[in-house]
Amino acid sequence: MKKSARRQSRELATQGLYQWLLSNAAPGEIDAQLRGALGYDKADKTLLDTILHGVIREHATLAEAISPSLDRPIDQLSPVERAVLLIATYELTHQIETPYRVIINEAVELAKTFGGSDGYKYVNGVLDKLAVKLRPAETQARRGA
């Protein structure tokens, strides 16, 4: 199945954030490496830049929003799970036009692609809790329907 430009952007953002979390490389350095990555030409570059730079810029605030939904400190999560949760939290708070279920489904797919064997289940559980806090009207409408 062909990946959408938005999915490709999220995958590249995950790779870039993984690199940033491990090396604390400068965003410009990560951008340069991503431009040479497989699939960059098919990505929604605006979305990629928005997510990657938004998460890096707001990392501390996003981590603070995620933490109450975790069963351990965020720095004890694998870098992949942390990157995926940061991306999804950024989208839940800033990409209001994207339905929360789409954001969660995309995050689960990213965790399946890049994470450990059961990491996607953890990501799904955390984001279900987080969506109720960050998108209360939307989640209530869906659950009440």
Swiss-Prot record:
GO MF annotation, one: RNA binding
SUPFAM superfamilies from the UniProt entry: NusB-like
GO cellular component: cytosol
Biological process according to GO: DNA-templated transcription termination; transcription antitermination
Key words, A-Z: RNA-binding, Transcription, Transcription antitermination, Transcription regulation
Pfam families: NusB
InterPro entries membership: NusB-like_sf, NusB_fam, NusB_RsmB_TIM44
Family: Belongs to the NusB family.
Biological role stated in the UniProt entry: Involved in transcription antitermination. Required for transcription of ribosomal RNA (rRNA) genes. Binds specifically to the boxA antiterminator sequence of the ribosomal RNA (rrn) operons.
Protein name (record): Transcription antitermination protein NusB
Species of provenance: Burkholderia thailandensis (strain ATCC 700388 / DSM 13276 / CCUG 48851 / CIP 106301 / E264)
